[in-house]
């Protein structure tokens, strides 16, 4: 089967890392990129140099108005567009069947569907969506309906970390209820120094100077991808001054009591079996920087987990909120194309 051809709208953190993941995995072909604020020479520079993930290990250049990206194994010849209106991007002309909507702007079905006017067949929103169906690889991707799901969401990076872990625990032991905290790395929406921030005043405080309590819909979103957990999970975030890698703390009550060894065994089995490549298991004494560039959605930290009793436990899982998530965007497209 030929590789699915994709376009990327928005060449920011996720857009660029989706391209890196696509080149690395070699399961899709990127044929077009659109960003109204970045010209092709700047795209070359931004893709080549990355303060968090290091220099791109392949070769990138601008030739004949196209972005040429190769890593020695495969070459992507990418048409570049600079349109603000998604309906005006000629995805069909470029051969892009799947569009990754990674601007963070067009997250509703109505707005994201503008890509279909340009000839795209499917749109994958790389953010949570209020009205598009959300799919998390390893959790509910088997519910994808190719005939009817044209605009879908890959959920959030935090939901992609939490949901696989919650599924394993719920399937094996039953989750009665739970609270999640994500200790989350800085993202582009934060301020470098104190500045105005609408109603959520704390969000406007300097990212490099503070631990900032923040809201997140990631835990509630698990209820959308695992209906049995709807209304049973909620959570919050603490934004911290690190550039990448976040960690989920899931504290939950279990229906069926379990020792920590039994919980670890269940996660380890899933990581080696049905969730291989999505969920990972470690017993090493790791810290956040050890996971920069990790392609998994969720890395269970066996040594960091604790229990008060067999029915009340705190479970810890790491995730590269940039690169791990970008890998799942590519995987979701590959999966959908195979249906």
Swiss-Prot record:
The record marks 184 as: Activates thiol group during catalysis. CDD domains: GAPDH_I_C, GAPDH_I_N. Pathway: Carbohydrate degradation; glycolysis; pyruvate from D-glyceraldehyde 3-phosphate: step 1/5. Belongs to the glyceraldehyde-3-phosphate dehydrogenase family. Its EC number is 1.2.1.12. Its main location: cytoplasm. One of its GO terms (molecular function) is NADP binding. The active site is at 157 (nucleophile). Keywords: Cytoplasm, Glycolysis, NAD, Oxidoreductase. NAD(+) binds at residues 13-14, 35, 84, 321. This is Glyceraldehyde-3-phosphate dehydrogenase. One of its GO terms (biological process) is glycolytic process. SMART domains: Gp_dh_N. It holds the Pfam family Gp_dh_C. D-glyceraldehyde 3-phosphate binds at residues 156-158, 187, 216-217, 239. SUPFAM superfamilies: Glyceraldehyde-3-phosphate dehydrogenase-like, C-terminal domain (SSF55347), NAD(P)-binding Rossmann-fold domains (SSF51735). It is found in: Cytoplasm. The keyword Repeat does not apply. GO terms for cellular component: cytosol. It catalyses: D-glyceraldehyde 3-phosphate + phosphate + NAD(+) = (2R)-3-phospho-glyceroyl phosphate + NADH + H(+). The keyword Cytoplasm applies. It is an enzyme of class 1 (oxidoreductase). Homotetramer.
């Amino acid at each position: 089967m030929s590789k699915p051809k994709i376009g990327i709208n928005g060449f920011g953190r996720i857009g660029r890392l989706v391209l890196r993941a696509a080149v690395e995995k070699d399961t899709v072909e990127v044929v077009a990129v659109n960003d109204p604020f970045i010209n092709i020479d700047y795209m070359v520079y931004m893709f080549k140099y990355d303060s968090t993930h290091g220099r791109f290990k392949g070769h990138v250049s601008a030739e004949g108005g196209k972005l040429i990206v190769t890593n020695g194994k495969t070459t992507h010849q990418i048409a570049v567009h600079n349109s603000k209106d998604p309906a005006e991007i000629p995805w069909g002309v470029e051969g892009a069947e799947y569009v990754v909507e990674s601007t963070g702007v067009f997250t509703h079905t109505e707005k994201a569907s503008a890509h279909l006017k340009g000839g795209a067949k499917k749109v994958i929103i790389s953010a949570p969506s209020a009205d598009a169906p959300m799919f998390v690889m390893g959790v509910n991707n088997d519910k994808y309906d190719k005939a009817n799901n044209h605009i879908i969401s890959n959920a959030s990076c935090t939901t992609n970390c939490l949901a696989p872990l919650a599924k394993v625990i719920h399937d094996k032991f039953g989750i009665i209820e739970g609270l999640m905290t994500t200790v989350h790395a800085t993202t582009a929406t934060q301020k470098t120094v104190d500045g105005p921030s609408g109603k959520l005043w704390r969000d406007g405080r300097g990212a490099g100077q503070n631990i900032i309590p923040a809201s997140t819909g990631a835990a509630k979103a698990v209820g959308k991808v695992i209906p049995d957990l709807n209304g049973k999970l909620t959570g919050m975030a603490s934004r911290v001054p690190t550039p990448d890698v976040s960690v989920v703390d899931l504290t939950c009550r279990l229906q069926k009591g379990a020792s920590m060894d039994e919980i670890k065994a269940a996660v380890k089995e899933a990581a080696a079996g049905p969730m291989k490549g999505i969920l990972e298991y470690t017993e090493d004494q790791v810290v956040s920087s050890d996971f920069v560039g990790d392609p998994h959605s969720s890395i269970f930290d066996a040594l960091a987990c604790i229990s008060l009793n067999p029915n009340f436990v705190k479970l810890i899982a790491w995730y590269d909120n940039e690169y791990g998530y970008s890998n799942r965007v590519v995987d979701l497209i590959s999966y959908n194309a195979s249906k």
